[in-house]
Amino acid sequence: MSKPTLAVIGSGIAGLSAAWLLRNQYQVTLFERHARPGMGAYAVSAGTNQRTGKAVTIDIPLRVITSGYYNELFNLYKTLGVEIERTDHSGAFFTHTGGDIFHYKTYTIGERRFAFLNSPKRLSKHNISQGMAAIKFFAEIKKVDLSNVGNLTFGEFLQQWPHSKANFIDNVLMPMLSTICTCDYDSVKQYPASIIIGYLACGVAKDGVWKATHGVADIVQRITQGYQVEANCDIQNIKIDDTENSPIQVIFNRHQQTEKQSFDHIVIATQPQHAAPLIEAAAPEIVQHFKHIKYAKSSMVVHRDDSIYPRPWQDLSPVCYSINPSLQRPMATVCLNKSMPTVKDCLPIFQTWHPTTTIAADKTLADVTFERPVINFDTLKHIESIKQSMLKANNRVWFCGSYLGEGIPLLEAGVQSALFVANQLGAYKPW
Ligand SMILES: Cc1cc2nc3c(=O)[nH]c(=O)nc-3n(C[C@H](O)[C@H](O)[C@H](O)COP(=O)(O)OP(=O)(O)OC[C@H]3O[C@@H](n4cnc5c(N)ncnc54)[C@H](O)[C@@H]3O)c2cc1C
């Protein structure tokens, strides 16, 4: 008997995971508007590694992960055979005028890794006091009983928590969180406290940061086996007839031609702001929920312009934050040569989030603007309604994306949301 057909719209981590998890039970077609699957759509070539002579590709964004927080993603990578490697994301914090705030570095002794103050050159009374505040903060945040912070925003929680040292919160913690959540400080403070604490308490500071050794291209190659991928297909509309078992029509533009295909089920794995226009006519009541989910824009530049760093930059920790108190976000630059083993022997190359100074155009390799949902208590109500809509009997329209998982919309949440949909459609976790 032939399998039922299923369309997945969008090939970020959520769509790729859903398509892969459902490939045995359904005849799956994955549609992506970019020329390459979305997770790897913005990768850029960065020349060759001068030691190995191998070509180097840089993913945009890098997509780093931590073992304590990314349970399902680690399981997925293991099942797919994706190798992972450690990266160094320790930080150097400066004011926008170049004044020292805080420097820490990751040290390795045998198998153990730990964060501590950077080189003696950077030791100062101020740096030591920030270091002590950080140690205290991360030790105490693990002890917070999440059931006691249920109604608090993260901002409210910080205001009443005795371990919140204003200097550390404003100059170190908020710049880091604003970079991780890619939104402004006010939006970070509007996150439910339990979500941010859940992230901070998961050993982020202790176990360090990892990434896929061979980058997103390797993940995509493994996770696109066993089903059909249709790139360059910009979905315009989805037509759903309420009559039971009537096919769902997917209408899309490919190379300036309009095409149409029919499916038994559909998984919309785009971000919420892109899902709404697709189902405006077919499911207006759900569109209202999508329209309430806010998103933030952020830009990322990959470049070779070292003037972005305070001098001398060579001994700084890999991630350099520039903090201007009159702005709502820091500028954060990763020196990829220091952070990633595969890029160590390449010409200097940097990835800057939210540039606030000019990066030389002739040293720029890529400049990409991203959108990403931000979570607050109002958003959570609408997300819950979207989840409930999928539990209706005989439902055939499914949604997944990192905004529908638990916690911060990161890769882990994307995989969680795909597992939820796969489970509803009769496919179980292969791990
Ligand atoms: C700057 C930045 C840095 C980040 N760094 C990290 C990190 O280090 N670690 C981490 O865990 N997370 C990180 N994230 C978050 C992570 O990238 C997201 O959580 C994740 O990409 C969301 O996956 P998704 O599948 O839900 O959505 P997306 O990745 O947005 O995928 C949706 C896909 O749908 C496609 N699409 C949309 N509309 C249509 C249409 N009409 N037709 C066809 N296709 C369509 C899009 O092109 C896209 O490919 C970062 C995010 C940003 C913005």
Task: Cite the ranges covered by each PLM segment.
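Conserved flavin/dinucleotide-binding core of flavoenzymes
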Residues: 329-431
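Helical element adjacent to the flavin cofactor pocket in flavoenzyme catalytic cores
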Residues: 196-257
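N-terminal Rossmann-like FAD-binding beta1-loop-alpha1 element of flavoenzymes
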Residues: 4-30
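Glycine-rich FAD pyrophosphate-binding loop
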Residues: 23-48
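Mid-domain catalytic core of redox enzymes
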Residues: 236-375
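Conserved Rossmann-like nucleotide-cofactor binding loop
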Residues: 14, 36, 273
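N-terminal glycine-rich dinucleotide-binding loop that anchors FAD/FMN and/or NAD(P) in oxidoreductases
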Residues: 44-73
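Mobile amphipathic helical/loop "lid" adjacent to a hydrophobic cofactor/ligand pocket
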Residues: 67-189
